[in-house]
């Protein structure tokens, strides 16, 4: 099991940041590796909500995501599965700070098959990818007021 963690400050209210991230269908707007993401359960977002995401890096493989913990606006817990590639479990935490939100993440990544051989590389690459993704989110939320209109 590999751990990937980090944090970032976002100059937006904690409720806005939480709501935007909790709706996984927003992720293609700030994660260039996610082609699209669809909510496959009905009802409001919460524990049990599931998504299917199409990633560039996995070719035809779908990433199945399920929300396993939901405490608005402080905690979002999920698990993701990419068949034959990896499982990811983790949490994103949100803290109100002066001027915005401190967002921290921690993922446990379990590679499968030949991906297990790339363990240390997955950790380094994963850390860089997460920093890139969350920095892109920060830029989107801080510079584009219309980004939150869809929430």
For the regions a protein language model found, what residue spans apply to each?
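Hydrophobic ligand-binding cavity/cleft-lining segments
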Residues: 1-41, 136-142, 149-151
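A conserved amphipathic terminal alpha-helix motif
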Residues: 109-151
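Hydrophobic alpha-helical core bundles mediating ligand binding, dimerization, or RNAP-core interactions
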Residues: 21, 31, 67, 107, ...
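Hydrophobic-ligand binding "helix-grip"
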Residues: 28, 44, 54-104, 108-113, ...
